[in-house]
Amino acid sequence: MLHMILSQRVILLRKYHSSANALVTKSPNSIPELVKHIDSDLIRNAHKVFDEIPELDVISATAVIGRFVKESRHVEASQAFKRLLCLGIRPNEFTFGTVIGSSTTSRDVKLGKQLHCYALKMGLASNVFVGSAVLNCYVKLSTLTDARRCFDDTRDPNVVSITNLISGYLKKHEFEEALSLFRAMPERSVVTWNAVIGGFSQTGRNEEAVNTFVDMLREGVVIPNESTFPCAITAISNIASHGAGKSIHACAIKFLGKRFNVFVWNSLISFYSKCGNMEDSLLAFNKLEEEQRNIVSWNSMIWGYAHNGRGEEAVAMFEKMVKDTNLRPNNVTILGVLFACNHAGLIQEGYMYFNKAVNDYDDPNLLELEHYACMVDMLSRSGRFKEAEELIKSMPLDPGIGFWKALLGGCQIHSNKRLAKLAASKILELDPRDVSSYVMLSNAYSAMENWQNVSLIRRKMKETGLKRFTGCSWIEVRDQIRVFVNADKNNELKDEVYRMLALVSQHLEENECWKDL
């Protein structure tokens, strides 16, 4: 049956190929039409079509190259371009734009630069179509200096070129350059606004992202779309501003109406969970049709429950996903459920999910460093040090300092001296200048009442010039930030603060609340 189908496809292709001469003479668009109809499985034979068409022109050749690019056959695309040159056909701006785009996708910056040089030689580099393709290549694969030079050389750069350069500046944290270019634009499209909002959000400049979104609304020229709101909501999620986030949610309802897509809902699920409001997070999740929910939707719910101390609900959500959908858990899903089990004390369940990930999912890349670290931490916290040590020995990855810190933390809780000594030696071996490692070691030895080693650690810190960072915390009361520094004697309210601290400590001691902390 399969042989018959393949034979029919070959016969059909030969039929198209045999009539190529006639098609060429009738219409300059006939060859692109022919290329468009070639079956994907037989795309290799398009090269034969390219070679044997007697009156091949730049339009036909560009169409063939474009088809190679569409099929992600970038090597063949560059070979076809070379063949075009050998045949003496002069490439136009669309040929260059297509093949330079191919070099960007295949991450071949050397080829991209060669094509740019050839376009310069032919006087096409200043063309906006070629310039946009070269600029995109340099932004993604080379330096912003090259990209800016290309931008300045482009005649009448379009909004795509400007947006690409702005995105490049933001990714490299060159915010002033990005904003200067953005403000100088005579017209800003929604794509450009989205690039700036998303760029700020992705680089941790969340307040600037939200302010840019507000500026967009204030100008009232461009209407935000379904790509704008995930960027703005993600930014407001990162600063956990519940009131502002609800306002953006209301804006999304106003501007999008029924055009809410899965990306908007997923960002809202994550936002409400980060604000500790799992009820509204679940409402947003339930607004999605079952067939709309993707792995990000489920991961957001699992992680939301886990981070908010509702480990059993996180596990239940994971089980519901496995049972009711055809979605395969990814590494984010597995880490979320392990994190939930770890902090909810569900050790057996955590072990079960970890073993399933190892044995059942047939994906060698599913478990990463963080998954093993989470399991080591889980076993160490529960006092199962032998199993933790065996897990580290059986790891396919080289354990880093994070593993040994997790192990040392568990040793500190359960006073396991032998394993603590092993973890301590590994930590100091891997990073002898890490202050937090020395602090952890000192605390671990103190918990085990090993005062000699505590003294040794402190002496070593002093000899190497390392200083422990002073602990501090802060709270917001009536729009004022109050900062508390460890052992602070300079605060004007220090007497009242320490008096209240003593009362709170006494209350916790009398009611045996320490064990819950």
Curated annotation (Swiss-Prot):
Q: Which UniProt keywords apply?
A: Mitochondrion, Repeat, Transit peptide
GO molecular function terms attached to this record: RNA binding
Coiled-coil boundaries:
none
Region entry Type E(+) motif, spans = 479-509
Subcellular locations according to the entry: Mitochondrion
- The transit peptide of this chain lies at 1-23
Give the GO biological process terms: RNA modification
Q: Where are the PPR repeats?
A: 57-91, 92-126, 127-157, 158-188, 189-223, 225-259, 261-291, 294-329, 368-398
Keyword DNA damage carried by entry: no
Q: Extract the InterPro entries matched here.
A: E_motif, Pentatricopeptide_rpt, PPR_At4g14850-like_plant, TPR-like_helical_dom_sf
Look up keyword Transmembrane helix and say if it applies: no
Q: Which GO terms describe its cellular component?
A: mitochondrion
Highest taxon of the source? Eukaryota
One Pfam assignment:
PPR_2
* Chain segments carrying region Type E motif: 403-478
Which PANTHER family does this UniProt record tie to the protein?
PENTATRICOPEPTIDE REPEAT-CONTAINING PROTEIN (PTHR47926:SF357)
The family note in this entry says: Belongs to the PPR family. PCMP-E subfamily.
By what name is this protein known?
Pentatricopeptide repeat-containing protein At5g42450, mitochondrial
Please name the taxonomic classification of the source.
Eukaryota, Viridiplantae, Streptophyta, Embryophyta, Tracheophyta
